[in-house]
Amino acid sequence: MTRFDNLQQFINTHLNAKLHTLNAITGDASFRRYYRLSHDNKHLIVMDSDPKKVNNEPYISLNQVFVEQGFLLPTIIASDEKQGFFVLSDLGSTHLADMLDDANRTEHYQALISLSAQWAKTPAASAMQAYNEDFIKVELDIFSQWLVSDFINEPLSAEQKIMWQTSSELLIQAMLEQPTVTVHRDYHSRNIMNSNGQWAIIDYQDAVRGPLCYDLVSLLRDCYFKLPQEELTSLLYFAYQEFTDQNLLVNTSFDEFKYWFDLTGLQRHLKAAGIFCRLYLRDGKTGYLDNILPTLDYIAEVAANYSELKALSEWTKNTIVPKVTEKLAKERS
């Protein structure tokens, strides 16, 4: 029997749903596959998450953690953990990404900033790793390995190696000096849903204990959508006040908060650009190629605002972006 046959058998056994239809849903960047199941005029989500490829334990344990804190997540209705099959509640198909042209977009973002503050206050759980120095270094290596070395085959000069080392150390320091909170790690427009007027969170299984500004920069400097600068600045002030009111920030100036926000974003975008390349080179996923250049643009733009990171900005703008542009043109020809 194929894996799909086993999945069908699981559905028949656990839901008594021999008469059903399964429609594939565009998956995320992981090895998971999702289907919308229709049965007796009801809709459910079926997740195929092979335990040989994915550790499903955090998905299960953190679901309970966050639901107990009052967050709306997919409910796990049935599961076969040995095979990695799950039946989940259907939260609909409306993501924040589908609502970005709304006239009340700013209000959406303000509500989601407030929600992220509540998420941050979730107590630590055993499934949450510490977003420590080693963890951050591993993520930065994704950029240097998968984008710089493997995707564009760009050797680093001795001077560039020093620049990369000093820039990395600066980003690590900025992330580690922030308050440590519960971090979703992918809090962006494709992982936030609106279900019957209520905000819902998906793809929560990689939650860690890490820097306060991480989820905020994931939301406001989204790899898939760029907010106008004026709107972003206004929302950043809103977030500063919200985090202060929630006692997540204590005796922190706005300038220091913005510095944390900017440098945390640089680390996230370096990692993300590398992951987009890895998804293509290792996993054969072409759907993220279009996101590489906008993500690199964030890096060049933000790093240029800090004298100690100007070399990173120039290298990104003058070396990395042209090489990536050339490589993308070749891959698409």
Regions picked out by a protein language model, each given a short descriptive name:
Residues Y59, R105-L112, I136, W164, ...:
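Hydrophobic packing residues in well-ordered alpha-helices of helical domains and bundles
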Residues M1-F85, V181, N196-A200, T316-S333:
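Conserved NTP-binding catalytic cores of kinases and kinase-like/nucleotidyltransferase enzymes
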Residues L7, T13-H14, A124-Q129, D134-F135, ...:
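An alpha-helical support segment within catalytic cores of ATP-dependent transferases
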Residues R32-V138, I142, I152, L176:
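ATP-binding pocket architecture of kinase catalytic cores
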Residues S144-F151, L212-L249, L263-D283, T295-V302:
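Active-site activation/catalytic loop segments of kinase-like enzymes and analogous catalytic loops
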Residues G274-S333:
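ATP/Mg2+ or Mg2+-diphosphate-binding catalytic cores
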Residues F31-L37, V46, W119, E169-L216, ...:
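Active-site acidic catalytic loop and adjacent metal/ATP-binding pocket
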Residues V250-Y259:
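Histidine/acidic-rich helix-loop-helix segments that form or flank divalent-metal centers
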